[in-house]
Amino acid sequence: HINHANWLCLSLLTREGHITSHHISVSIESKPRHTLRPLAVFVRIFTRAMPKYKLSYFPLRGRAEAIRITFAVAGVEFDDILVNPEEWFTKLKHSGLSPSGQLPILEVDGTVLTQSKAILSYLAKEFNLAPKGNLQQAQADSLAHVVNELETTLTEAYGEKDPERKEKGMKTATEEVIPDKCGYFEKILSANKNGFFIGEKLTYADIVVFTFLNSYFMKGKAEGIPEGLKKFPSLSAWYERVRTQPKILEKLKNPTDGFVDYIY
């Protein structure tokens, strides 16, 4: 089914429509068959079914929350499957559900993608949230990898079984590693001067950094700027700018039900 808006777009793209003021009407002139082929291509594009997305992860924000926020920003529906950790480690991990034996995974019409930052990069390209050009996309990937390092540092420290080593690891992460990376983010934002990490609009680089900082400092809550960021002026201003994006703020105020408490 092609609605009125789609016909308008089609007519503009093919330059075969006529638009009148006051009441917009669109007509497609009768043309020889060969000249209508571009129109047929656009019809297929406009009527193409949206893929079915299914995200599987533990009942945490963790490494999947930036993916959830990306869907929210794009306004795209997906199945948010919360996997019971005990069931995962005793049965599902080796079932073939995840080729890598890790979560999160994203199923796209049955095709399984693994690795959270690769999933984010894919969705960014699908939803027009990727920067322009290969160089800027590489910059976005670089920021995503920095966040991945932070997540790994926290996960390994938090999961340490020896109490003394755990305490030392968490102290290093919270007092040294995270402040150091916040300083790194501050430098990038100060240099860009456009209000976002890359270019002049929100990209998945902003989403992945924001989600980590919000999850770590605020436990996913929607309120204000974290105390830990206030000594970084550019980072603080950026955080508030991203936090108050309407779809992000709405998502923060309406988190996924069933989460358990975690370090990020």
Language-model segments: residues:
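Surface-exposed helix-capping loop/turn segments at secondary-structure junctions
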Residues: L129, K187-E200, A222, Q245-L252
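Carbohydrate-binding/catalytic loop surfaces
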Residues: E164-E167, T256-Y264
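GST-like domain detector, emphasizing the conserved glutathione-binding G-site
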Residues: F46-T172, E176-C182, A191-K193, F197, ...
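GST superfamily/GST-like fold recognition
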Residues: A140, F197-E223, K231-S236
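Short, Lys/Arg-enriched N-terminal segments with co-localized hydrophobic residues
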Residues: S25-A49
